[in-house]
Amino acid sequence: MKKTGIIKAMLLCKKYEKMSQEQRDELRIQRLHRLVKYARENSPYYSQLYSDLPADFTLQDLPATDKRTLMENWDDWVCDDSLKLADVEKFMGNPDNIGAFFNKKYMVITTSGSTGNPLVAVLDKTANNIMGGISASRSYARKQDLKAFMKNGKKTMAVFADGGFYLGNSSVRSRLKTMPWKKKQMGVSSALYPMEDIVKQLNDFQPAMLGGYPSHLELLAEEAQKGRLNISPVVIMTGGEYLSDNVRKKLADTFNCYVQTSYSCTEGGAVACECTNQHFHINDDWLIVEPVDANGNPVPDGVLSDKILLTNLYNYTQPFIRYEVTDRVIMHHEACGCGNPSPWIELEGRTDDITAFVQDDKVIKIAPLAIYAVLKEVHSLRRFQVLVCSENRVEMRIEQMDNCDRLVTFEQASAHLKNFLATQGITDVNVILSDTLPQQHPVSGKFKHVVNMQNI
């Protein structure tokens, strides 16, 4: 793919929005064929996978791929033979490298690892710029919010897990490393900090745009209602979790601003942007989303899928082509009242619970992604589920990785959790190992990593 700067990427996004449906479909096919051709010529893995692929192939002719297989073949998967997973993992061993460019060429990002070992991904500068172009062109559902953001100093602060090479964290850190003068306009607060520290940072920074996980922002709304948090954002953008109608209204009423969300993932960046009708419109000039059932068969519009197959049309260094993502969506092609002709999806998001502990007669609430971010660092854990019960009793359901001792894994996870809770002022906690493995809800079929078992 030709080198593309962020301005050109923005122009390409705007140009696409003016195309007819026929032109859009043709562009998507061209980009898919160019990507597949490049992957066959530069990736040993794809060269073998596509060895019998006809020249006039369609999207459905391409075999599906998945994280486990691609990670097992990482060195052959990428299209730059100088890239080696061992070198990238060594680079990731230094947290100072978050947001830095590996070999001065690639930003390194990783998934959260909710379904086993995390994916390690690399983005060249063109891929970074296209992600930035999509964000700059389509992030704001309402033009007046963008204007208000610009008018109020363009100051942004996000609250999320900042200790890893995650997409949001790495992207912000990268911008701050390359443009250090942006520090007065862009900030990050860790979701792992005690709430009073986050509140102080936000009060000092006074962001015009506030971002973060819905569950954490809900706790910040309570801080504002109690008079401790005093900020006036013009827009709130959430991500990483499902944004319920109740939380959306609570945030809007508390901060007196518009609240919106988006659908992003490590493999595809901003997959879909929310419109004023709260529909997630797919950025289908750069990404292809296929809803499928458990066996990989197409799911019709209006039906909840078991997963999706995602094709990223702009990452040439590490092609994600019909890549399995375990998010469940409902696809729509009917017209949306906002005027955006791109298909839109309903997304079944994460539904983990806010929990609460009591220390010295004080109730301390904890956002679920804070607990999740701590425990995913225990690499011997394949899956986990934390049940928070009354009297600060925590039941931990775990599934350890192959060749790892179950009791040792639990002790590591328990220590990580207790150390984190201590930073929140919670020291009286009893963590026990459950005989039960992590499991879905017997009725809804939904899986929660963090489950509240008490009334709060």
Enumerate the predicted regions with their spans.
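Conserved AMP-binding/adenylate-forming
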Residues: 234, 243-335
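AMP-binding/adenylate-forming
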Residues: 126-135, 155-216
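Short, hinge-like loop/turn segments at secondary-structure boundaries
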Residues: 175, 228-229, 277-281
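Residue-level signal for inorganic ion chemistry
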Residues: 39, 111, 156, 210, ...
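AMP-binding/adenylate-forming catalytic core of the ANL superfamily
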Residues: 210, 314-317, 321-424
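Nucleotide 5′-phosphate-binding alpha/beta core
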Residues: 1-110, 117-137, 144-151, 204-211, ...
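Adenylate-forming
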Residues: 190-193, 197, 207-248, 260-267
